[in-house]
Design a protein with these regions (language model features):
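Active-site-proximal specificity loops/subdomain of glycosyltransferases
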Residues: 138-144, 148-200
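Membrane-proximal basic amphipathic "stem/tether" segments
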Residues: 2-60
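Conserved small/polar residues in nucleotide/adenosyl-binding loops
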Residues: 287-289
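N-proximal low-complexity "stem/linker" segments adjacent to membrane-targeting elements
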Residues: 36-114
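Short beta-strand-to-loop acidic/aromatic patch adjacent to the donor-nucleotide binding site
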Residues: 201-212
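Conserved catalytic core of nucleotide-sugar-dependent glycosyltransferases
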Residues: 214-283
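Short loop->beta transition adjacent to catalytic acidic/histidine clusters or analogous donor-positioning motifs
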Residues: 76, 115-130, 153-155
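Short beta-strand/loop segment that forms part of the nucleotide-sugar
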Residues: 125-136, 159-162
C-alpha cells in the first residue's frame, strides 16, 4: 500500500469526474489515498481515525500501510475457567478490592460479553462461549447464567470432574513441595480446557475468571492475530495480559504492531492466552501439567 496526498483537490463534498476516475484507478492498483484537506481515506470512504481494517481481508495501520490477510480467522471459542468457591489458589492472600470471588467471575464474564459485542465486524464471526466450572454453588451458577441471559448469548456449561485428571497431575511442584487441592483442581480445569479445544474450529481463547477486558480486547486480539500470523506465515499464541514478571530479566525480543497496540515476543506466559486449534493439536502431547 502507498499513501499519496490530495493537496490539489478542493475541500468540497462534490466529487468531480476526474477525481472519481483517479480513485477507481488507485483502488485497482492497491493504493490508498488520503485527502489531506478532509483527512479522509477516500478509496475506502473512511476518516483517518476510523477503523480501516476489514476482518478477514486486510489490516491497515497508518502510516505503516496495509497487510493482506492470508490467515483469516474463521471462528472464536472463548473457554472460561471458573471456580467461585476458591478465593485464591494460595489462600493466605487477599485479592485486590477484597470482594467475594463470584464478583470477580461475574465482572470477567460481563467484560468478555461486552467486548465480543462491541465491534460490528465481529458480528460476522462465529463466537462461542464455554464455561468449565469447578465446585461453584448453585446460587453462583445461576448468577453466571443470568449474565449470559442478559446479553442474550448462549453458552455451554461443563461441571469439572477432577478425578478424571488426578493421575496425570504431578503432586510435587518444582520446589519439591506438595501441591494443594486447589492447585490440583486448577490444573484439572486446564486439562479439560485443552481437551475441549479439540472440538473447536479455529481460534480458542483460554481465560481465567479474574481478568477484566476492555471493550476492544476481543477485536484487538482477532485483528492482531490475522495481521501477525499473515506477516509471519504461521500460527501464533497471543497473551493479552502484559505480566510484570516478564520484565524481571532482560532478554532478546521482537516487537510487532497490532491493530491499536504494540506487541512483543515472549518465551512464557500464564494460562490466559489465545491460539489456534492447529497449535493445540500439534503440541498437546508435549504439554505436562
Amino acid at each position: 500500500i502507498y499513501f499519496a496526498s490530495m493537496k490539489n483537490f478542493q475541500n468540497s463534498k462534490k466529487t468531480g469526474f476526474l477525481k472519481k476516475i483517479f480513485i477507481k484507478l488507485c483502488r485497482i492498483l492497491g493504493f490508498e489515498i488520503i485527502d489531506q484537506n478532509t483527512f479522509e481515506i477516500v478509496t475506502i470512504d473512511k476518516k483517518i481515525n476510523d477503523e480501516a481494517t476489514i476482518i478477514g481481508k486486510n489490516s491497515i495501520n497508518l502510516p505503516l500501510g496495509i497487510v493482506k490477510v492470508t490467515r483469516p480467522v474463521k471462528s472464536l471459542d472463548i473457554i472460561i475457567r471458573t471456580c467461585t468457591s476458591v478465593n485464591m489458589l494460595t489462600q493466605n492472600k487477599n485479592r485486590l478490592f477484597e470482594k467475594e470471588k463470584i464478583e470477580y467471575t461475574l465482572r470477567t464474564i460481563r467484560s468478555l460479553l461486552y467486548s465480543a459485542k462491541s465491534n460490528t465486524q465481529l458480528k460476522n464471526l462465529k463466537i462461542s462461549f464455554k464455561v468449565i466450572d469447578h465446585n461453584s454453588s448453585e446460587e453462583n451458577l445461576k448468577k453466571i447464567d443470568s449474565i449470559f441471559k442478559k446479553f442474550e448469548t448462549e453458552y455451554y456449561l461443563i461441571n469439572l470432574d477432577v478425578s478424571k485428571f488426578e493421575k496425570e497431575i504431578k503432586k510435587i511442584n518444582e520446589r519439591g513441595q506438595d501441591i494443594s487441592s486447589n492447585q490440583i483442581s486448577n490444573m484439572a480445569n486446564i486439562h479439560q480446557s485443552l481437551l475441549e479445544a479439540k472440538n473447536c474450529e479455529d481460534l480458542i481463547y483460554f481465560v481465567e475468571d479474574d481478568y477484566l477486558h476492555q471493550r476492544n480486547s476481543i477485536s484487538e486480539m482477532i485483528f492482531t492475530y490475522e495481521r501477525i500470523a499473515s506477516q509471519l506465515n504461521k500460527e501464533i499464541i497471543i497473551c493479552p495480559s502484559d505480566y510484570p514478571y516478564l520484565y524481571t530479566r532482560a532478554g532478546i525480543t521482537q516487537n510487532f504492531l497490532g491493530q491499536n497496540y504494540h506487541w512483543r515476543k515472549v518465551d512464557e506466559t500464564l494460562c490466559t492466552f489465545l491460539t489456534s486449534k492447529q497449535i493445540i493439536e500439534k503440541y498437546l502431547s508435549l504439554i505436562h501439567i
